[in-house]
Amino acid sequence: MSFDEGLYEWAKEALEPLGIVSLRRMMGAAVLYLDGTIFAVVEDEIWFKADADSAAIWDAEGCARFTFTDKDGKVETMNYRRAPTDVYDDVEAMQRWASLAVEAGLRSAAKKRPKKPKGAPPV
């Protein structure tokens, strides 16, 4: 994986009306956030966050699931989908698909239990 700074700049510019896009570099790629909500991974292409609620929409568009081979040679998938080709040159498409990904990111964050402070007694 190699991070494409140009894709980040494009996403940042296209999504400016929706909020602030930020990134965190990770293993040669970058995780993108919109107003603090994870919504994509960028390497040499964009992979949008997805979930069971949005799977049918991504499937209908033919957006492949993110897959990788783990250290034991097993192929694994993650809840990210390859961006439709129109997001690379159409602001409205970028906003539409990124919004769907942000919704998945918000649902994912809502499902996670808050971490207990260190030293807190068991509940």
What are the functions of these language-model segments?
Residues 1-123:
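Charge-dense, helix-prone N-terminal extensions
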